[in-house]
């Protein structure tokens, strides 16, 4: 999965550099004329990706994940909420404390009940958090535990029960909260703030937590089965999830992210150099093809925003991208000739360059039609650890075009 995502990002970057003039930042168009050559011709693209996957240590691991990943309802809800906000033009950044995050990663509990224990005094939760990167700033974390409708539970004088979250190693208290079963005996999610846990995690790949419940001022531990915290007959959607909120320490670049993924797979310098050579060759071919087209009728149109529909399923990315399966990216196309229109918001340099080009086209190239304003989109995808991740990627949709 990691290899496929890396290749996908790499292919995306190569195309970005292939757009007219100044390599404007737009995504790959699936619509092209039948006779037109393209650096991403179907057969060549498939062969290119196949070569990289075959040489990747992660390629063999991709077939190991036979069980389909089912996204948790909570993650789907997050995606729908923030993608809807983006469509309304609102700031879709969600927040934790006074900081904003652009990534939410969900880790599903891998623990199992010991059916020999009756009553069940402790519930153990296991999470594989090896995919968390130290290059991202942690800005929040919460443990979401589904509590089924309680059965015949030992009565509490106040009706209030205390949830205690402990570390498996030291039984050090990590978080706590109270629930009132007199007010609510229906099934619901209990949420514990576990941000502080990661301050003591020390780069461990496995996170082990234990839950116990007491009532009143008593230290007596209540049978968790009676309270509805047992795992028996639970669906995948009812398993506990650890939700981690992170923020990139710097503005993300898809190409840089792809390079980091190649390094994490352990590829040697020779393989990386080969990829860079292929990228340069394809970029040159793409630029030559596109420059050749600019002598046609389409080159007469002025710089403006054009349609560019991206279909992730047609690209073969739907095995790791959950949503959206397609979106409108747009791109900038057209000439920047003199006099430049004010709505194109040309820079002073672009105005001078365009004027020089109008007087002597052979000595000065024209200014470039490029995106001047871009917006983000939300993507829900599966990472290399088979965890479902929500991420907000910047600069994915062209909003305005201009001459630069």
Swiss-Prot record:
GO cellular component, one term: extracellular space
InterPro entries given in the database record: Cystine-knot_cytokine, TGF-b_C, TGF-b_propeptide, TGF-beta-rel, TGFb_CS
Residues carrying sugar: 91
Alphabetical list of SUPFAM superfamilies matching this protein: Cystine-knot cytokines (SSF57501)
Domain of life: Eukaryota
Chain positions covered by the region annotation Disordered: 263-304
UniProt keyword list: Apoptosis, Cleavage on pair of basic residues, Developmental protein, Disulfide bond, Glycoprotein, Growth factor, Secreted, Signal
Record CDD domains: TGF_beta_GDF5_6_7
Gene3D superfamilies tied to this protein: 2.60.120.970, Cystine-knot cytokines
Keyword Signal on entry: yes
Disulfide-bonded cysteines: 303-369, 332-401, 336-403
Propeptide feature ranges: 25-284
Gene Ontology biological-process annotations: apoptotic process; blood vessel maturation; blood vessel morphogenesis; BMP signaling pathway; camera-type eye development; camera-type eye photoreceptor cell differentiation; determination of ventral identity; dorsal/ventral pattern formation
Biased segments, Basic residues type: 278-304
Keyword Membrane attributed: no
Tissue expression: First expressed in late gastrula stage embryos (9.5 hours post fertilization (hpf)) in anterior neuroectoderm corresponding to the future dorsal part of the brain. Shortly after tailbud formation (11 hpf), expression expands to the entire neural region and is subsequently expressed in derivatives of the lateral neural plate and migrating neural crest cells, with the future midbrain and hindbrain showing strong expression. Also expressed weakly and transiently in the posterior embryo from 11.5 hpf to 15 hpf in the lateral mesoderm, and in ectoderm above the neural keel.
Gene null: resulting phenotype: Adults display microphthalmia, with eyes obscured by overgrown skin and misshapen irides. Mutants at 2 weeks of age show profound alterations in the morphology of individual photoreceptor subtypes and UV cones. At later timepoints loss of normal retinal lamination is observed, together with a disorganization of Mueller glia cells. Adults, cone photoreceptors are dysmorphic and reduced in abundance.
Signal sequence residues: 1-24
Subcellular location as annotated: Secreted
Family to which the UniProt record says this protein belongs: Belongs to the TGF-beta family.
General function of this protein: Growth factor that controls proliferation and cellular differentiation in the retina. Plays a key role in regulating apoptosis during retinal development. Establishes dorsal-ventral positional information in the retina and controls the formation of the retinotectal map. Functions maternally in dorsal/ventral patterning to induce the expression of the zygotic bmp2b and bmp4 genes and ventralize embryos. Zygotic expression does not appear to regulate axis specification, but instead functions to establish the integrity of the axial vessels during embryonic development.
Quaternary context: Homodimer; disulfide-linked.
Protein name: Growth/differentiation factor 6-A
Annotated source species: Danio rerio (Zebrafish)
Classification of source organism: Eukaryota, Metazoa, Chordata, Craniata, Vertebrata
């Amino acid at each position: 999965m990691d290899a496929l995502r890396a290749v996908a990002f790499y292919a995306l970057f190569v195309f970005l550099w292939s757009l007219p003039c100044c390599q404007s930042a737009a995504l790959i168009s699936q619509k092209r004329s039948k006779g037109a050559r393209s650096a991403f011709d179907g057969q060549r693209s498939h062969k290119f990706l196949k070569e990289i996957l075959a040489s990747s240590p992660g390629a063999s691991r991709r077939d190991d994940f036979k069980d389909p990943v089912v996204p948790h309802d909570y993650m789907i809800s997050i995606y729908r909420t923030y993608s809807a906000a983006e469509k309304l033009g609102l700031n879709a950044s969600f927040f934790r404390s006074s900081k904003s995050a652009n990534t939410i990663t969900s880790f599903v509990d891998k623990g199992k009940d010991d059916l020999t224990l009756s009553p069940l005094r402790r519930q153990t939760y296991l999470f594989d958090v090896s995919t968390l990167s130290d290059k991202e700033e942690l800005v929040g974390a919460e443990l979401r535990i589904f509590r089924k409708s309680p059965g015949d539970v030992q009565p509490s004088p106040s009706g209030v029960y205390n949830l205690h979250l402990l570390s498996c190693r030291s039984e050090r208290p990590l978080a706590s909260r109270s629930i009132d079963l007199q007010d609510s005996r229906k099934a619901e999610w209990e949420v514990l703030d576990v941000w502080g846990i990661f301050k003591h995690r020390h780069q461990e790949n496995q996170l082990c937590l234990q839950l116990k419940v007491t009532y009143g001022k008593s230290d007596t531990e209540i049978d968790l089965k009676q309270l509805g915290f047992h795992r028996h007959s639970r669906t995948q959607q009812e398993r506990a999830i650890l939700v981690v909120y992170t923020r990139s320490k710097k503005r993300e670049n898809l190409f840089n992210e792809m390079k980091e993924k190649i390094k994490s797979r352990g590829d040697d310098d020779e393989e990386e150099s080969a990829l860079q050579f292929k990228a340069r060759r394809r970029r040159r071919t793409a630029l030559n093809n596109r420059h050749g087209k600019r002598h046609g009728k389409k080159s007469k149109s002025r710089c403006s925003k054009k349609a560019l529909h991206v279909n992730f399923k047609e690209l073969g990315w739907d095995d790791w991208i959950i949503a959206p399966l397609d979106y409108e990216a747009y791109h900038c196309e057209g000439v920047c000739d003199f006099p430049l229109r004010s709505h194109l918001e040309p820079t002073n340099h672009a105005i001078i360059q365009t004027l020089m080009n109008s007087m002597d086209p052979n000595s000065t190239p024209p200014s470039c039609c490029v995106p001047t304003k871009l917006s983000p989109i939300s993507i829900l995808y599966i990472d290399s650890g088979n965890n479902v991740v929500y991420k907000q990627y910047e600069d994915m949709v062209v909003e305005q075009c201009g001459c630069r």
